[in-house]
Regions:
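Active-site groove signature of glycoside hydrolases
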Residues: 99-125
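Active-site mouth loops of central-metabolism enzymes
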Residues: 1-10, 77-92, 128-136
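Short, acidic/polar
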Residues: 7-20, 86-102, 138, 142-143, ...
Length: 200
């Protein structure tokens, strides 16, 4: 999350070497990283990981599980891509750029960083503005990911900062239409933050 902002490329490579030498094999990033990003530095974290992957070679890359995420709308990050949504154009562009940045032929786990629809998240309470134009598109999103999986560009899909309703909808659509099933939920969850339990 900090490679490219708080950490230089050399520091990032050293930290990755240190982690892998001690048995870490799961690397989680996102197209929007580093945190505190802007139009000049977004994607730096993926690029630093990519230059490190290029350095260690293809045989070592196969031992890693690399996860990255597509940014959703409503966070003031239009510098990433316009429109910032989960349309076929947007998802395809995001995957292609992440593959290029990460210098890899495939992404092991590709997640939606937060839902496309407006909802309470990131500590927000009480949605102030409902987007009445948003149309439910769980089936369409899964169909897009199905195509990318068949092309070999991603292996698995997941969600992040999602609520139980969204998880249920994705699972229901995947079962109903024989589409890829989400394999991960990356949500904040601790003794101090148990909001995900509310909808269960």
């Amino acid at each position: 999350m900090t490679f490219g902002n708080q950490n230089t490329e050399i520091e990032a490579h050293n930290q990755l070497d240190y982690a892998v030498e001690r048995g870490i094999n799961f690397l989680d990033t996102a197209e929007m990283y580093p945190i505190g990003g802007n139009a000049q530095i977004f994607g730096s974290t993926e690029r630093f990981i990519g230059s490190w992957i290029n350095k260690i070679g293809a045989s070592q890359r196969e031992k890693l599980v690399i996860a990255t995420k597509i940014a959703g709308p409503n966070r003031g990050m239009e510098y990433i891509r316009k429109p910032l949504d989960f349309s076929k154009k947007s998802i395809t562009e995001a995957v292609e750029l992440s593959l290029k940045n990460l210098q890899t032929d495939y992404i092991d786990l590709y997640q939606m960083h937060w839902p496309e629809r407006v909802m309470n998240m990131f500590g927000q309470r009480g949605v102030s503005k409902i987007d009445t134009n948003w149309q439910e598109n769980f089936f369409e999103v899964l169909t897009i990911f199905d195509g990318l999986i068949k092309e070999g560009k991603i292996k698995h899909i997941g969600v992040s900062n999602e609520n139980p309703y969204g998880v249920m909808k994705f699972i229901n659509e995947s079962e109903k239409h024989n589409l890829p099933r989400i394999v991960s939920i990356q949500n904040p969850y601790s003794l101090l933050n148990r909001l995900f339990e509310v909808g269960l």
